[in-house]
């Protein structure tokens, strides 16, 4: 995503945060997500457009896989505006994420979803990805 397109994604990011019951902080978002504008060593922010309207985004974080001794990509965020769900935009963002990770030489693309997000799980099952047998843990460090 370019600098010129950046301001258009911030309202979608806030919508994504509200979906997961987090209270958006516009100033913090503006600083944090700027690090993913291309080119970036931290990751990549991808947008999905329908005409002039930004209707979805994905955030990739560059990371590592010790078991494979290789770089990997984590699709940490995937969001499609409510009025555009079911139009293939989520699948297109996953495919664009996989392409971007592959072009960067990543071994694999991984992502997580909430256990009760069955809509997203149905989408993910269509990508050819395999469901992991791992549990995801989170330790707050505040």
Region locations from a protein language model:
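Helix-loop element at the rim of GNAT/NAT acetyltransferase active sites that forms part
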Residues: 10-24, 66
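Active-site rim helix/loop that mediates acceptor-substrate recognition in acyltransferases
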Residues: 24-45
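A short, internal acetyl-CoA/4′-phosphopantetheine-binding micro-motif in the GNAT/acyltransferase core
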Residues: 78-85
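Conserved active-site alpha-helix within GNAT-family acetyltransferase domains
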Residues: 91, 95, 103, 115-133, ...
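Conserved GNAT acetyl-CoA-binding A-motif
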Residues: 101-113
């Amino acid at each position: 995503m370019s600098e010129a397109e950046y301001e258009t994604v911030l309202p979608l990011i806030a919508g994504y945060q509200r979906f997961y019951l987090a209270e958006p902080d516009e100033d913090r978002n503006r600083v944090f997500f700027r690090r993913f504008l291309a080119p970036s060593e931290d990751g990549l922010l991808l947008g999905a457009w329908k005409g002039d309207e930004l209707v979805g985004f994905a955030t990739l974080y560059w990371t590592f896989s010790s078991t494979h001794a290789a770089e990997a990509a984590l699709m940490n965020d995937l969001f499609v505006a409510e009025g555009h769900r079911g139009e293939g935009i989520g699948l297109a963002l996953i495919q664009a994420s996989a392409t971007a990770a592959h072009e960067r030489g990543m071994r694999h693309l991984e992502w997580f979803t909430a256990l009760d997000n069955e809509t997203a799980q149905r989408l993910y099952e269509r990508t050819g990805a395999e469901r992991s047998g791992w549990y995801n843990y989170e330790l707050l460090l505040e």
